[in-house]
Amino acid sequence: MADLKPYIAKAASGEPLSLGDAKAAFDIMMSGQATPSQIGGFLMALRVRGETVPEIAGAVASMRSRMIPVIAPDDAMDIVGTGGDQSGSYNVSSCTAFVVAGAGVPVAKHGNRALSSRSGAADALAALGINIEADADTIGRSISEAGLGFMFAPMHHSAMRHVGPSRVELGTRTIFNLLGPLSNPASVKRQLVGVFAPQWLEPLAHVLKELGSETAWVVYGDGLDEMTTAGTTQVAALENGQIRTFEITPEEVGLRRCSPAELKGGEAAENAKALLGVLEGKDSAYRDIVLLNSGAALVVAGKAENLKDGIAQAVQSIDSGAALAVLQKVIAVSNDKPA
């Protein structure tokens, strides 16, 4: 039986692991050969020392080798946050996904239940009536027929069951918060990824490049793992094989600045109700932050020339009812009913 202890010792001493060592360590954890104490110790050793790009890439390689894939169009994208930002904000990326799909871009959305917050993507979507435990074929059909499919991480990364209890008991972010956005079961090549801390902007952009992404924006919004309308958003953009960094404020793209308190969410049912309100056309700070993120996603998808153009398309997606129609179709298809 393989042993995680040498890798724990290495990480605890402050020594970085090579990509190969990281993959080996994650293979041990993902195959159920490590105890919860060992998993917790290893994850926290990495967290305290600071995870490296090779360690993240090795961990992703381990996860991808075990995942149940989903078939999606070549131009599909993912819109996802790492979680772990401790903000308790609304489910911005989930709402954004419906708006982007309503604008004509297929979305293969990867997400999980809350691990360090009150309501994760899966919690809110389940509260809306989406069957988050649909199988891979049904999700593929949802993407092709409704424009969006939701892939519940534990269904596609069943090996995660070995580390799930340790993550919940730790109650704080770990390397796994970084891995979710990098382990999309539909192997999308375009991503809008939010991170929980600015030091991860460029490293994750480099990891995405290494993993074959064509276009991606990695964003941090002043305390949020999304683009923000309550402050300045920092972006590391992977475009044409190059990575550039820049900042965006809401005012420069014609959106109102709000206070962080206006973006505070609640439990899953409350967040689901607020999400539905945005798709039904209600004006709010939540709508504005969704418009900003949707505009960026449409730029990443190649559907919009710039952020202002993307925001205009997002407004049209909501106000025409297209985004709401996507939600209704996803609910139907995920529950095996005609769209």
From Swiss-Prot:
Anthranilate 1 binds at G81, N112. Its cofactor is Mg(2+). One of its GO terms (molecular function) is magnesium ion binding. Coiled coil: none annotated. It is an enzyme of class 2 (transferase). One of its GO terms (cellular component) is cytosol. Mg(2+) 2 binds at D225, E226. The keyword Iron does not apply. Anthranilate 2 binds at R167. 5-phospho-alpha-D-ribose 1-diphosphate binds at residues 81, 84-85, 89, 91-94, 109-117, 121. InterPro entries: Anthranilate_Pribosyl_Tfrase, Glycosyl_Trfase_fam3, Glycosyl_Trfase_fam3_N_dom, Glycosyl_Trfase_fam3_N_dom_sf, Nuc_phospho_transferase. Pathway: Amino-acid biosynthesis; L-tryptophan biosynthesis; L-tryptophan from chorismate: step 2/5. Keywords: Amino-acid biosynthesis, Aromatic amino acid biosynthesis, Glycosyltransferase, Magnesium, Metal-binding, Transferase, Tryptophan biosynthesis. Mg(2+) 1 binds at S93, E226. It catalyses: N-(5-phospho-beta-D-ribosyl)anthranilate + diphosphate = 5-phospho-alpha-D-ribose 1-diphosphate + anthranilate. Binds 2 magnesium ions per monomer. One of its GO terms (biological process) is L-tryptophan biosynthetic process. Belongs to the anthranilate phosphoribosyltransferase family. Homodimer. Catalyzes the transfer of the phosphoribosyl group of 5-phosphorylribose-1-pyrophosphate (PRPP) to anthranilate to yield N-(5'-phosphoribosyl)-anthranilate (PRA). PANTHER family: ANTHRANILATE PHOSPHORIBOSYLTRANSFERASE. This is Anthranilate phosphoribosyltransferase. It comes from Brucella canis (strain ATCC 23365 / NCTC 10854 / RM-666). The gene is trpD.
